[in-house]
Amino acid sequence: MASIIVRHNESFDDALRRFKRGVAKDGTLQEVRKREFYVKPSVARKLKSEAAQKRARKRARNDH
């Protein structure tokens, strides 16, 4: 979990911005969204395969 220490004369907005950056860097929100619902292993494999195919199509489209 990201944590920060508010610096002397640091505004709340600056501290909040640093905290948000730390949370994004840690991947905390991404992990929470991933674990929000249970996904069966077979469905997870299918989604992973579909995402890989989509990336491959996108990469092939961008490679000239």
UniProtKB/Swiss-Prot annotation:
Q: What is this protein called?
A: Small ribosomal subunit protein bS21
Q: Which family does it belong to?
A: Belongs to the bacterial ribosomal protein bS21 family.
One GO process term, biological-process aspect: translation
Gene name of the record: rpsU
Q: What GO annotations for molecular function exist for this entry? A: structural constituent of ribosome
UniProt keywords (A-Z) are:
Ribonucleoprotein, Ribosomal protein
Q: Which organism is it from?
A: Oenococcus oeni (strain ATCC BAA-331 / PSU-1)
The record's listing under PROSITE patterns reads:
RIBOSOMAL_S21
List the GO terms this entry assigns under cellular component, sorted alphabetically: ribonucleoprotein complex; ribosome
